Amino acid sequence: NLKIIPSKKEIQKSIRSLSPEIKKAIDETYKRVKDWHVKQKPKDIFYKDKFNNKFYYKNKSIRSVACYVPGNLPSTLIMCATPAIIAGVKRIVVCTPSLNGKLNGAVYYAASILGIKECYSLGGASAIMALATGTPKVKPVDKIVGPGSKWVALAKKKVFLEGLCGIEAANMGPSEILCIADSSSDSEIIASSCIAQNEHSPDS
């Protein structure tokens, strides 16, 4: 059984199971996501009017954020954590459930290249509550981001409405997609696009 806080040995073992191709894909994904979000970072503003009044608008990051990552989606961690890194958040946490008692090496490899060292092997609504309120083993955070099941989405909404923790959205549950196609479309590509969403939840 895995502990709530995986050991370095367990994490390294999971990462060693990855092929060079997977690592390269994760590296490239991080580079592309980072390049985009760097351009989005708002700039501080200093202004002095003709009466010598000085105005200063400073962007300041929150202290901590947790990235909730469904068990097999390193892309989710990259997309959630990269903006926080660029914003200057000092404490970034990853919370991801194990799958059949095993760590997902791709998620933990993504965490390693992002420089995230605080990792929790937890999932579901209980993970959201632990991150929002804290436990003897899980330190609370200021904000929780990332998708999950409908139970995760409801838990995020609850901790937000009770003033326990910030969230980025309350409706990031199972995916809802629409494929627009006509007689010229490839039916296999359309079907695979829909089937790909089933990894999120049976009711996606």
What kind of feature is each model-predicted range?
Residues 2, 45, 53, 57-60, ...:
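Flexible, active-site-adjacent loop/turn segments at secondary-structure boundaries
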Residues 6, 21-24, 28, 60, ...:
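Conserved active-site and cofactor/substrate-binding residues in soluble primary-metabolism enzymes
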Residues 115-203:
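Conserved NAD(P)+-binding/catalytic subdomain of aldehyde/semialdehyde dehydrogenases
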Residues 47-109:
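Conserved small-residue-rich beta-alpha loop and adjacent elements
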Residues 1-63:
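N-terminal Rossmann-like NAD(P)+-binding subdomain of aldehyde/semialdehyde dehydrogenases
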Residues 35, 104-115:
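N-terminal small/polar loop signature for handling phosphorylated ligands or for N-terminal nucleophile
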Residues 85, 112, 132:
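Short polybasic/polar patches that bind polyanions
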